[in-house]
């Protein structure tokens, strides 16, 4: 992802408009830049310790109920909040760490990475992307996704 792509994402977020459509477009741009087929953005309800799906691209329809609400500490997105940093998997289908829940394996995703969305130093959500093939996102790709997470921070309300 080049600086121009970050600028493009920033521009989409600054344009405003309908929040769900804006987040969906930003997610689509991020996925294209990182050659990914699936993506989710979750907003954190820190009081209830739940992540709520606010945008997704590429998930099978039957998975939407599974990822609609995720408790902090559960699954890849929930673990991202607990760690306060990235969670990556080379192949979600063969993961034995216990982080990827059985339902997540139904997505067909191989490589995956999820990072916090921050407003300042406060985690306000997560952004996760994945690909259908076995793939380990590089530290550079993860770092760029974290930059996007900071851009998204003010867009989650």
Q: Where are the regions a protein language model picked out?
A:
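Short beta-strand-to-loop transition segments that serve as allosteric relay/switch motifs
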Residues: 126-136
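Short, hydrophobic-rich beta-strand element in sensory/regulatory alpha-beta domains
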Residues: 27-31, 37-43, 78
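A short, aliphatic-rich beta-strand micro-motif
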Residues: 110-118
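Allosteric cytosolic regulatory segments
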Residues: 146-154
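Regulatory sensory and allosteric helical modules in signal-transduction proteins
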Residues: 44, 50-52, 61-94
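Short hydrophobic/glycine-rich mini-motifs in sensory/regulatory modules
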Residues: 117-127
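Signal-transmission linkers at sensory-effector interfaces
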Residues: 1-21, 32
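Signal-transducing coupling segments at domain and membrane junctions
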Residues: 50, 60-63, 90-111, 131
